[in-house]
Regions:
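Active-site-proximal segment of zinc-dependent metalloprotease catalytic domains
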Residues: 1-82
Length: 190
C-alpha cells in the first residue's frame, strides 16, 4: 500500500508473512515485488524485499534505488530544505555505509577520499567543490545533505542513484557496499 509513514510515494506490503508463506517452497535470496500501477512510488526494506511500481515512467531508476536499500542497506542520499524531523542525530554515526555524521568517518569512505580532496572534508576548498557538476557520481568527497536532512548528514558524491533518479549509476561508495555483500554471499565458506 502507498502512504507508508504518511508519504504518498512510499510503497510497502502489509502482507509480508503471507508473501513468505507463498514463497516457502521456492529457493530465494531476495524478493522484488512489482505493483501493476502507474502511480509513482516504491520501497526497499533491508534484507527483506524491494517493492516498486511497474508502469510508471521512472520504474527503472526507482527499482534500482529501492534495491540499494533492500539488498545493500543503503540510505537515501536526498534531503529536504524544509526538514521537520531529524532522522539522524548529529552525535550518532548512521549504520548505513553511504552516509555519515562525521562521528566515525573512518568506518565509512575516508579510505576512498583522494588526498587532494582531503581538505574538502574540513571545508577549506569550498570553491573546488562548487566547480563539480551536480550530476557527478564519481568525484568522492564529503557533501552536506543526505538522509532527508540538509545539514549535519553527508554523502560521498554530488549525485548517486541513492540521491536522484537522474543519476547514471551508484556512486563508488555504494558500489563498494554492494560488491562487499555480493562477495560475502559468493566467497567460499558462505
Amino acid at each position: 500500500h502507498f502512504d507508508t509513514f504518511y508519504s504518498a510515494r512510499y510503497l510497502t506490503t502489509l502482507h509480508l508473512r503471507q508473501l513468505h508463506d507463498l514463497l516457502a517452497g521456492i529457493p530465494y535470496e531476495h524478493i522484488i515485488i512489482l505493483a501493476n500501477t502507474d502511480h509513482y512510488g516504491g520501497g526497499g526494506i533491508y534484507n527483506s524485499y524491494t517493492l516498486t511500481t511497474a508502469r510508471h515512467a521512472a520504474f527503472r531508476p526507482v527499482v534500482v534505488h529501492e534495491f540499494g536499500h533492500s539488498f545493500a542497506g543503503l540510505a537515501d542520499e536526498y534531503y529536504y530544505d524544509d526538514q521537520y524531523v531529524e532522522y539522524y542525530y548529529p552525535h550518532i554515526e548512521p549504520w548505513e555505509h553511504n552516509i555519515t555524521t562525521m562521528k566515525d568517518f573512518s568506518a565509512k569512505w575516508e579510505d576512498m577520499l583522494p588526498k587532494e580532496n582531503a581538505q574538502k572534508r574540513t571545508g577549506k576548498k569550498k570553491r573546488a567543490q562548487q566547480e563539480i557538476s551536480p550530476l557527478d557520481t564519481e568525484t568522492i568527497g564529503v557533501y552536506e545533505g543526505a538522509g532527508y536532512q540538509s545539514k549535519g548528514v553527508y554523502r560521498s558524491t554530488p549525485n548517486c542513484r541513492m540521491k536522484t533518479n537522474e543519476a547514471a549509476a551508484f556512486c563508488p561508495v555504494c558500489r563498494r557496499s554492494i560488491q562487499r555483500l555480493v562477495q560475502f554471499y559468493t566467497e567460499a565458506g558462505h
